[in-house]
Amino acid sequence: GHHSYVGPEVILGNNVEILHNVSIQGKVVIGDFTKIESGTVIGAVGFGYYKDEEGNPIAIPHLGGVVIGSHVTIGANNTISRGCLADTVIEDYVKTDNSCHIAHNDHIGKRTMLAAGVVISGSTTIEENVWLAPGTLVIDGVCIENNAFTGIGAVVTKNVSKGKVVAGIPAKTLRDRYD
């Protein structure tokens, strides 16, 4: 697309569609038949800091990359941070709506759907066939297991078991997804 940047380390599969004003930088691999909507940034440095002896925040190097599978759609104005040491991974057939954030070291499983405004903090695992409703916030380090579903605006602060529906602040289990 117009005004897009694809860095020299980026590896693109066949039939990748990149729309306008996209930035893809660092060690990024994108699979076949994947679409990246306008305004998205892939491979940005993650939000990781430590405090020095004087209490000043010092950036932690992010040496990993981003691996995006095949048949993925990344919506407009998404940000996907590269991993700290390991890669941030988005598996095949994942679909993200507009304005989603996927942080460093996250792993998103196959056929997972992220609706508008989802924010996933770092080092989080989202397994396969998960639905994250609009505005879902996921704290760092949790696991949302296969076939789980979050309600609109859910704040996920702990692991979500396979096939459960959670909602609320903080998110609580309501029922099985396929009752």
Spans of features found by a protein language model:
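Structural signal for interior beta-strand "rungs" in well-ordered beta-sheet cores
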Residues: 1-167, 171-174
